[in-house]
Regions:
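Short beta->alpha junction loops
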Residues: 36, 60-70, 188-189
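Short, well-structured alpha-helical segments in soluble
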Residues: 72-84
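Positively charged, low-complexity intrinsically disordered leader regions
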Residues: 1-26
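Short beta-strand segments
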Residues: 34, 90-94, 162, 203
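Short beta-strand segments enriched in small/hydrophobic residues
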Residues: 27-37
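Glycine-rich phosphate/diphosphate-binding loop of Rossmann-like nucleotide-binding domains
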Residues: 41-49, 132-224, 229, 233-250
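Anion-binding alpha/beta catalytic cores of soluble intermediary-metabolism enzymes, centered on
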Residues: 90-154, 208
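Rossmann-fold NAD(P)-binding glycine/threonine-rich loop
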Residues: 104-123, 223-278
Length: 281
């Protein structure tokens, strides 16, 4: 019990990606589309490009102006997706508020939707289709749980998820249910506590909203948020140091170097999956 070593899990995932890439005759390509100049997005894109290149995955990054209109943005994304050499396509979020995010995402074909955010991929995930592409953060949470359980079957676990977003809560509920977990999905309007949960997953996006008094012995806490505290330091929803100080029998992810580093690794898994779904060898 204690701090979950997400760095070790990340290395295991990346080694899996390397093994899959070594068996391929061709080279998968990831195409990242960015609209505007969001500072956080620049950091995330840089990390994705760095990780992909280290693995030997081709990467193309296309930066679009923040004043681009909806129609032109859709046309650009469609043109990128129509190129057979682009196997995995992602729209880096957030995008400027005048654009319709859902329309842009759904331009991407299911088999190239490396982020797993199209309506079709979400429906396939809910229906437990093996060719569904799972959003990377949700997959990262699952990778933690299946390694801790040493089994893909999660029928032993009751999970409380505090997030209902398209990126985390909704796909995670479907993914964990597909692996036989019992999942309770909460949000800002819910009246909830964590009593009875074996696993708590948080993603509310508020620095240090949870402390040791919110949790119980024997639980696993997975913090999916990346916030900044009053001093400008990166932190999660949970004050993990306070939790570890007051509860001995508990597992918890750190922030930083927690779920965030698994997200990029799982995205690389999805790049290979996209390539294979298109008949790549």
């Amino acid at each position: 019990m204690g701090l979950i070593d997400c760095k070790a899990i990340r290395e295991e995932i990346l080694n899996d990606v390397k093994s899959q890439l070594a068996e391929l005759k061709g080279t998968p390509r990831l195409c990242i589309v960015t609209i505007g100049n969001d500072d956080a997005s620049k950091v995330y894109v840089r990390n994705k490009i760095k990780t992909a290149k280290e693995l030997g995955i081709d990467v193309q990054h296309l930066q679009l102006d923040d004043d681009i209109c909806q129609e032109e943005a859709e046309q650009v994304i469609e043109a990128i997706c129509n190129r057979s050499t682009n196997h995995a396509v992602m729209l880096q979020l957030p995008i400027p508020s005048h654009l319709n995010k859902d329309r842009l995402l759904n331009v991407i074909p299911q088999h190239k939707d490396v982020d797993g955010l199209t309506d079709l991929n979400m429906g396939m995930l809910v229906n437990n289709r093996q060719d569904a592409i799972v959003p990377a953060t949700a997959q990262g949470v699952y990778e933690i749980l299946r390694r801790m359980n040493r089994n893909d079957d999660l029928s032993w676990v009751n999970v409380t998820v505090v997030n209902r977003s398209q990126l985390i809560g909704k796909p995670l509920q479907a993914l964990l249910t597909n692996h036989n977990a019992t999942v309770t999905l909460c949000h800002s309007k819910s009246d909830y506590d964590f009593d009875g949960a074996d696993v708590v997953v948080t993603g509310i996006g508020h620095a240090h909203s949870y402390y040791s008094e919110d949790f119980f012995d024997g639980q696993t806490i997975i913090d999916c948020s990346m916030n900044r505290n009053e001093d400008g330091h990166l932190c999660g929803d949970v004050n993990y140091k306070d939790v570890l100080t007051h509860i001995r029998d508990i597992d918890i992810t750190p922030v930083p170097s927690g779920v965030g580093i698994l997200t990029t690794a799982c995205l690389m898994l999805n790049v290979v999956k996209c390539y294979l779904l298109q008949g790549g060898e």
